[in-house]
Amino acid sequence: MASHTNEIDEADRRDFLVLAGNAFAAVGAASLLWPFVQQMNPDASAKALSSTEIDLAPVKEGQAITVLWRGKPVFIRNRTAAEIEAARKVDLDKLPGGTDAADELRVKKGHENWLVLVGICTHLGCIPKGQAMGDAKGDFGGWFCPCHGSHYDTSGRIRLGPAPRNLDVPPYEFVSDTKIKIG
């Protein structure tokens, strides 16, 4: 009987040693892999480029500015009441985005005059004209892509030409009445 109990104690001790050894190996492997995983995270300079704040106070009604965000041009336009009205009168059924292209969904509530768009044509990546006062704004008063003739309206929606979708709206928020944070 004593030898049988001794064998059980040996098996329990062996199982414990195997378990402890495996746990020790797992902790060792994790501590070796951690630096390799951490080096894949973005550093402080990359994180700083992921968002940008823009002061909108100097931009008067009817004016537009272009800023860079993640290396892409972002169009910011302080739209006039006439531009907003024209954008909202459009029959949404005739637009590629349908009801998802409603002007109200492309701007922030309470700041409907501010339109923020990624300034890259969705056809082949050209930069549309329409930001400067003398630029051609296309047939719909918004932007015109000179590469292949896409026309966007005052809400950045594709109205004519080969572009497959509307100009993209980047993630942004108003941090105050005159400042936005993109990204």
Where do the PLM segments sit?
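Residue-level signal for the membrane-embedded core of alpha-helical transmembrane segments
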Residues: 24, 28-31
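N-terminal secretory signal peptides and thylakoid transit peptides that target proteins
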Residues: 5-24
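Short, acidic/polar N-cap/turn motifs at the starts of alpha helices
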Residues: 51, 62-66, 142, 169-171
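Residues that act as N-cap/strand-start positions at coil-to-secondary-structure junctions
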Residues: 48, 59-61, 166
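Aromatic-capped interface at the extracytoplasmic side
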Residues: 32-52
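Short extracytoplasmic
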Residues: 53-83
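N-terminal intrinsically disordered, acidic low-complexity segments at the extreme N-terminus
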Residues: 1-2
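Rieske [2Fe-2S] iron-sulfur-binding domain
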Residues: 89-183
